[in-house]
């Protein structure tokens, strides 16, 4: 594998990476979500893991809402710490204050890489205020000096009833039709 050259169309070389159906689905999902692009994964945990690993580095902190899906909880609390990544949670039912307190607690533990939000939460349907999350994160700096990303898993509502990209111009995860979509903007 190599990077494509200028003015080169990479083509479809390996069906697990890309194929005509997958390409069409990703293009249509990007249009549906009003996003620049989209990526389709085989499972929700593949999308979540890929996104978190893209931003987590040893010594960084991921702040997350709670409760979250069990696989995500295991990744945040058992797997990522083995690689020097700390996770700090807050209950979505605690409102904006709980989120602000989690950010305050995280500040002394390392650079904040990401704010991971599952809203509505599964199985409690707890909601997180995405506009407040954006406001809180706007005053922070991640390990690279940039603002930490906000990652939203909106499995329960999808893009018809909830549009995270309209409120949070970072990443959105949506599981539907037994797949996950990560949409960068």
Predicted regions: what they are:
Residues 1-46, 71-79:
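Conserved N-terminal alpha-helix of the aminotransferase class I/II PLP-enzyme fold
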Residues 37-185:
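Conserved PLP-enzyme active-site core in the AAT-like
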């Amino acid at each position: 594998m190599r990077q494509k050259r200028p003015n080169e169309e990479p083509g479809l070389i390996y069906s697990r990476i890309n194929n005509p159906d997958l390409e069409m689905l990703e293009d249509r999902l990007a249009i549906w979500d009003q996003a620049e692009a989209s990526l389709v994964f085989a499972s929700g945990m593949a999308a979540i893991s890929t996104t978190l690993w893209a931003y987590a580095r040893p010594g960084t902190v991921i702040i997350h809402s709670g409760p979250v899906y069990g696989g995500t909880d295991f990744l945040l609390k058992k797997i990522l710490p083995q690689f020097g990544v700390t996770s700090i949670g807050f209950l979505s039912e605690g409102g904006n204050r709980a989120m602000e307190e989690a950010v305050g607690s995280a500040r002394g533990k390392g650079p904040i890489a990401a704010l991971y939000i599952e809203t509505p939460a599964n199985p409690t349907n707890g909601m997180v205020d995405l506009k407040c999350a954006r406001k809180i994160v706007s005053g922070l700096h991640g390990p690279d000096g940039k603002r930490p990303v906000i990652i939203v898993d909106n499995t329960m509502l999808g893009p018809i009833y909830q549009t995270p990209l309209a409120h949070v111009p970072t990443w959105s995860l949506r599981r539907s039709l037994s797949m996950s979509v990560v949409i960068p903007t």
